[in-house]
Amino acid sequence: MAKTPVRARKRVKKQVVDGVRHIHASFNNTIVTITDRQGNALAWATAGGSGFRGSRKSTPFAAQVAAERCAEIVKEFGLKNLEVMVKGPGPGRESTIRALNAAGFRITNITDVTPIPHNGCRPPKKRRV
């Protein structure tokens, strides 16, 4: 008995004009996520996933490469305007925004959403190196 060939459905690329760029910059890594206005993730990239390991993962250049990788993926969606949300104290904060600007996106506003405790949990002890 011959099997009928199963056709794969063509995925319809949704067109998104406005998006939100979430940058989570920690001391060890930088995570870049691009979402639409509703918060649905379109693309994401990390400094570690971009081929950087160890101490090189926490550099501004690694964050820039991650931002460029994410920008390439999102170009297919027709994204033009971006709102940037930056979280964390890491070294990749500014370089990711510069990489976005160089990729040709129009940045509408930049917001710092770093969580600041109102005297919550006790912070870790200071490092003695």
From Swiss-Prot:
The keyword DNA damage does not apply. InterPro entries: Ribosomal_uS11, Ribosomal_uS11_bac-type, Ribosomal_uS11_CS, Ribosomal_uS11_sf. GO terms for cellular component: cytosolic small ribosomal subunit. It comes from the Bacteria. Pfam families: Ribosomal_S11. GO terms for molecular function: rRNA binding; structural constituent of ribosome. Keywords: Ribonucleoprotein, Ribosomal protein, RNA-binding, rRNA-binding. GO terms for biological process: translation. The keyword rRNA-binding applies. Part of the 30S ribosomal subunit. Interacts with proteins S7 and S18. Binds to IF-3. Located on the platform of the 30S subunit, it bridges several disparate RNA helices of the 16S rRNA. Forms part of the Shine-Dalgarno cleft in the 70S ribosome. Belongs to the universal ribosomal protein uS11 family. This is Small ribosomal subunit protein uS11.
